[in-house]
Structure formats: C-alpha cells, structure tokens
Regions:
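The feature marks the mature, well-folded catalytic cores of soluble enzymes
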Residues: 79-345, 349-387
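Glycine-rich phosphate- or other oxyanion-binding loops that anchor nucleotides, phosphorylated ligands
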Residues: 1-77
C-alpha cells in the first residue's frame, strides 16, 4: 500500500500492484488470463475519514467506467482456442533469394548498398536490411554514379536497366526467376508481332516492369469486365500472360473469358502464377474450411498476402491482414475458438510465432498444422554475389 511520492511514481510507470485480495482472485482464475482493477482510497497515511475521500472515490468510479468497455473486450477475447497453421506459408524461394542477395551484397561491398524499391513487399524485411546499411530508393537516378544497386524481386523494365547503365551503376539483379520467365514470354510474343494481354494489377511493380518489355504491345487486363471489353488490332495474333501473385481462381476466370473471346489466343507454356502463390492459397483454403477466423500476416502492399486474405474471405470466414502482432484487434477474437493463421510469401515466419504467442496470452492454445504440400525449390544466386 503506497501513498504520496511512491503512489505518483507507480502511476507514471503504469505498474500493477497486486495485494493479497487480488492474489485470491488469481487463484480463482485457475491459471487462465485475468485482470484486476483496484482503487485504493484508504491508506495509513491518508485515512478514509477526510474531506478529499469522496472526490477520490468519484474519480475512481469514473475511471472504472471508462475502463469497463476495454476490459469487456479483453474478457470476450479470452479463453482456450485452437490455432491451425497453414503449410506452406511465409517466405518463398524467390523472396529468400532476393533477401540473401542484399545481405551478400552488403557483406561483399559494404554499406551503403542501394536497392531500387522495396526488395520484397514487407516492412519488417526492409527495416532489417536498412539497419544493416541498405538504402532504399524509388528510382536509380537517386543512386550516386558508380554505386552498387540491387534491383528488387518484382523485376524492372529495360528502361530502368538502361538508366542504371547510363549512370555507371554496378547492378545486381534480384528479379525472381519466375517473374523473369514472364518477361521472356512477353518479349517472345512481342517479337512475333502479337498483342499481349497481361492479367494483373496495373499499379503493381511487377506489372509495371513486365509492361515495360513491350509497351506498345502489352495491355493490362485487371478484371473480368476488362477481359470482356479489351480489343486488339488482330484477334488472331494475340497471347496472354499473368502477374505471378494473383488469386488463382480469379486469374483463371479472366483467362477463360479471354480464351472464349479469342479462340486462337496463345496461352503461357506453363501457368504464370508462381508455385508459392498457388501453394499458399491452396493451404489457406484448406484451413478456412475448419476455423472461425483467419489471420494473414503480411504487409498491406504485398499482393500475394492480400490475395490470401481474399481467398479465405471467399470461403465465408472473417479474414484480416496484419503487418504484425501489434495490429491484432481483440474484438476479432470474441467467441472465436478456432483461428487459422498464415503468412504471405514475403512475410518472415517469426511474425507468425509472435501472433501465436499473443494468442497464448489470452488463454490455453493448441497449435496444429494443415499441410497441403511441401516446397523444396531453391534458386541460384547471380554471379555478382554467388562466391
């Protein structure tokens, strides 16, 4: 029991003082989460029978009323639950390769190493590499002449490469090999004089780079309505390609419309949507069939992470995308006994561990895994950092 300067000191630190009565309440909670809010208006140094006591009591009641809604939200979120982890999840081979390229470039050349755009779409990855000495820029004209620059995993247009060469930059290309494959397809069709319909989102960096391979030949098709209305100069000389991080079912619906409208359209030699995107969507679809809530860990600018949340939502399950555990909303967990959890291909898996740890703080958690396959893909590194 404290008063005076001691009370003020505790108040400023937000300390929680547990007395013997509160300890009895803790025992009654049987090891589960609990909170105790106590108001002390009587201490040896400040007896109850004095003029200021009613004021202190009324102030305490107002404080309790303000705290009550938050405590109710917290209470509703507590309880035992099962967490179903989607497998595979988190980093794909292309993301691992891109991050390793920046790490190796820093080891070999020393800081600063410049990176055009985010190496992958995840704020935590970018922050860690920044702490190591990577400098992220929007365009290569921000890089000092002669410096080392890494091109991000999403790929770039030939114009960006030309700008880098003109500045005498030492370029290390971290473009995902599966994205590079789409670039190769687009160039091949353009050289044949064919129109290319690129299924994807026009504001995504991957699409910007792919379009840049043949701007006069490529038209972006963003949705089913665009697929129904897009026109090409010669319907008999047309091909289509896909952004690698799309929702599989949505992309196929768009492609089906294009195949119906243009019977002679050339399809990709192999599905452009990458194996990791497909695998993670299949896993979250399986998880969504048996949970009350889905949480996807990933940054909001990550296309594949957003698609995971959308796939879960289309299964009729509430789904939320969070950058990390700090964005969890307790109100989502009210009455929820089964939580599905995944992470986008650019999100570190330790962020998933932090979410599980947070849920464990709200009650006993049983963790299970729902696996729809395993991944053993490994891409080689560019020669600039491979030795």
């Amino acid at each position: 029991v404290v008063d005076g300067d001691q009370r003020i000191a505790l108040a400023t630190t937000g300390a929680l003082v547990v007395d013997m009565e509160s300890a009895d309440l803790a025992a009654a909670a049987a090891g589960g989460p609990f909170a105790v809010v106590r108001v002390v208006v009587d201490t040896p140094g400040a007896p109850l029978l004095r003029p200021g006591t009613p004021v202190r009591g009324l102030t305490a009641l107002r404080t309790l009323r303000r705290a009550a809604p938050a405590l109710r939200t917290w209470l509703d979120a507590t309880g035992p639950r099962t967490v179903r982890l989607a497998e595979p999840r988190s980093f794909c081979a292309g993301v691992e390769r891109a991050i390793e390229i920046v790490d190796r470039a820093l080891d070999r050349y020393g800081a600063p190493v410049y990176v055009r755009r985010q190496i992958v779409h995840n704020a935590h990855v970018v922050r860690r590499l920044t702490d190591r000495g990577a400098v992220f820029v929007q365009e290569v004209d921000e890089v000092p002449p002669g410096a080392h620059v890494v091109l991000a995993a999403h790929g770039v247009s030939p114009a960006v490469r030309a700008d880098a060469d003109a500045r005498g930059l030492s370029v290390v290309d971290a473009t995902c090999p599966l994205v590079a494959k789409v670039h190769t397809e687009v160039r091949r069709h353009a050289r044949r004089g064919e129109s290319v319909l690129l299924i994807g989102h026009s504001d995504h960096e991957e699409v910007e780079g792919t379009v840049g391979e043949a701007p006069a030949r490529v038209t972006v098709v963003e949705d089913e309505e665009s697929a129904r209305t897009v026109e090409v100069p010669d319907p008999t000389r047309v091909a289509y390609a896909m952004q690698t991080t799309l929702a599989v079912d949505e992309a196929e619906r768009i492609a089906a419309i294009l195949r119906e409208r243009f019977p002679s359209i050339a399809a990709p030699r192999q599905d452009d949507i990458c194996y990791a995107t497909t695998n993670r969507q299949r896993a979250i679809r399986a998880v969504s069939a048996d949970v009350d809530l889905v949480i996807v860990v990933g940054s909001p600018n990550s296309s594949n992470s957003r698609r995971l949340a959308e796939v879960a939502a289309r299964q009729g399950v509430p789904a939320h995308l969070v950058d990390d555990v700090s964005e969890l909303d307790l109100s989502w967990l009210a009455g929820v006994g089964r939580v599905g959890l995944s992470a986008g291909a650019s999100a570190p898996d330790d962020l998933v561990d932090e979410v599980v740890s947070c849920l464990s703080g709200l009650g006993p958690v049983t963790v299970t895994a729902t696996s729809t396959g395993s991944e053993h893909v490994r891409f080689t590194l560019p020669k600039e950092v491979s030795h």
